[in-house]
From Swiss-Prot:
Its EC number is 2.7.1.35. PANTHER family: PYRIDOXAL KINASE (PTHR10534), PYRIDOXINE_PYRIDOXAL_PYRIDOXAMINE KINASE (PTHR10534:SF15). This is Pyridoxine/pyridoxal/pyridoxamine kinase. Signal peptide: none annotated. The gene is pdxK.
Amino acid sequence: MSSLLLFNDKSRALQADIVAVQSQVVYGSVGNSIAVPAIKQNGLNVFAVPTVLLSNTPHYDTFYGGAIPDEWFSGYLRALQERDALRQLRAVTTGYMGTASQIKILAEWLTALRKDHSDLLIMVDPVIGDIDSGIYVKPDLPEAYRQYLLPLAQGITPNIFELEILTGKNCRDLDSAIAAAKSLLSDTLKWVVITSASGNEENQEMQVVVVSADSVNVISHSRVKTDLKGTGDLFCAQLISGLLKGEALTDAVHRAGLRVLEVMRYTQQHESDELILPPLAEA
């Protein structure tokens, strides 16, 4: 078969259920390096678009790499359309973004994409920082999230610190966190999943809060003491997979949390510093 046929017949193009836009590492299990295999375990097709490419996370004594240049990043997105690979696209997820300009480029691409995919689910994990570390992204990223990505998202998955940054409100107790989340809801943004709400430290519990216009659901999970990285990326991968498989939002959040706990325990049993995905049948 000639290469002309192989590479010019768009009817033969691979198709994606999900485009996942976030960080990638050569060594380790964060960003798309954990999200892609997790999504594939759920029987879904995913294309990974990197925002940064690093040798490993900065928690090691050496690391190399950095943000993907804007020209490359916009080209990665454009190429998916040029290859006609998005006919069956159902969702786009975002995680760690390297620069504010990437967020603007992504928002423009999503806006154009929506013209042909009116039912597209856009889920944004607004990676900004956490209570322990503060802001660990470039200082212009929070405003870029507010200006460009939040108006396009159907759902977002901030932690408490990120919710505070996005809303400018104190969220250190459950009621204030719920109120802050509700302040973000709009005709487009239908739900907020707060991934680190106030839990019961004495009972070793953590809480995930699912907030929509007409309901609030608090989901409690066991707390696993660990410094493992990438658990939030894994959670979002499991969440979007559950939603695309037809699970209700609260059920998908609950199942995603349970899967993350299973993976963390499995990783600890294997004495690894990086997340290891067990087969779903063993989880």
